[in-house]
């Protein structure tokens, strides 16, 4: 009965998240590009064999991501993995239509096998408050230990709390007590490359050839066509979408690879690894017994010392 309830809760949460995501694509396409959803669509696992999280394939700029995970947790317990995605307040970026939009954030937490998103009935009031407005989803049905979040408004979600449930080795022999690794990624802002490999408008555009800029055509939608004439008189046209600002003008001489625009990107992706120890209750009991034993030994030594001092004093030594 409990498993059925958990499945219903998971499916309901996923359904709500899907509705929100589809709505965001339909009504706000300019702010919903290259977040964890795209990784789901294109990669079986969000982490490559090299250790790189695949979000970095679209988000080329590097920015710090911070994680707070408890040093150790008990079996079958709920704990918080906090992902911090820092950036300057009220920072704006360019959307797909070239307008300024607020940054959004996304995060992925790859938990060890056996660890998973804690069911909502086990969330504390504090966790419920900290996760209000945040929708979690599993990377896939087969990978319930990989949790993704986003896109979310960045200014109010620079810290994302993931409620995690640890496994219980006493009831499932597949899992063991010991040290485990977590792989965490956090992103702010749009990507520079689409999953197809095409550039977005959130990147520096460069010249593919050397020569002189013959002319620059401004298109109706605000984009540009930069016409470059090489030494043989051949014209190469570079398309620059709306958004980035041109830093060249007609008659400028340029080389292949030179930038034609500024760098409009203000966001970036960061990843890190963390460790957590799944603590055996017997080890905890053993440590407590050890410390009690050490304490008693010290007390006995002090008492023995005082007894010796009394004997010596009585004998006039």
Swiss-Prot record:
Q: Which residues form the signal peptide?
A: 1-34
GO MF: electron transfer activity; heme binding; iron ion binding
GO cellular component terms listed in the entry, alphabetical order: plasma membrane-derived thylakoid membrane
Q: Which domain of life is it from?
A: Bacteria
Q: How does it sit in the membrane?
A: Single-pass membrane protein
Residue positions annotated to bind heme are: 35, 55, 58-59
Subunit structure, as described in the record = The 4 large subunits of the cytochrome b6-f complex are cytochrome b6, subunit IV (17 kDa polypeptide, PetD), cytochrome f and the Rieske protein, while the 4 small subunits are PetG, PetL, PetM and PetN. The complex functions as a dimer.
The protein depicted here goes by the name Cytochrome f
| Protein's gene | petA
């Amino acid at each position: 009965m409990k498993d059925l309830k958990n499945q219903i809760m998971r499916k309901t949460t996923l359904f709500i998240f899907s509705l929100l995501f589809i709505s965001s694509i339909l009504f706000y396409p300019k702010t919903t590009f290259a977040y964890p959803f795209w990784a789901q669509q294109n990669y079986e696992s969000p982490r490559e064999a090299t250790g790189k999280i695949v979000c970095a394939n679209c988000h080329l700029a590097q920015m710090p991501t911070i994680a707070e995970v408890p040093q150790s947790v008990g079996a079958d317990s709920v704990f918080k993995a906090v992902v911090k995605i820092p950036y300057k307040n009220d920072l704006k970026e360019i959307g797909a239509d070239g307008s300024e939009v607020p940054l959004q954030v996304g995060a992925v937490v790859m938990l060890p096998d056996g660890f998973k998103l804690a069911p909502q009935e086990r969330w504390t009031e504090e966790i419920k408050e900290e996760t209000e407005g945040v929708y979690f989803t599993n990377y896939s049905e087969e990978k319930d230990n990989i949790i993704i979040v986003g896109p979310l408004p960045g200014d109010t979600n620079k810290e994302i709390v993931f409620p995690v449930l640890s496994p219980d080795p006493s009831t499932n022999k597949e899992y063991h007590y010991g040290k485990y690794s977590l792989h965490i990624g956090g992103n702010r802002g749009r990507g520079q490359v689409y999953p197809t490999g095409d550039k977005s408008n959130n990147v520096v555009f460069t010249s593919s050839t050397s020569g002189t800029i013959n002319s620059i055509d401004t298109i109706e939608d605000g984009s540009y066509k930069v016409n470059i004439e090489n030494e043989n008189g051949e014209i190469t046209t570079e398309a620059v979408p709306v958004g980035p600002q041109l830093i060249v003008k007609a008659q400028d001489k340029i080389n292949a690879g030179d930038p034609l625009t500024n760098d409009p990107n203000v966001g970036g992706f960061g990843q890190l690894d963390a460790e957590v120890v799944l603590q055996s209750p017997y080890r905890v009991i053993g440590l407590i017994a050890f410390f009690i034993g050490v304490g008693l030994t010290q007390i006995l030594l002090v008492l023995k010392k005082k007894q010796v001092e009394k004997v010596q004093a009585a004998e006039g030594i």
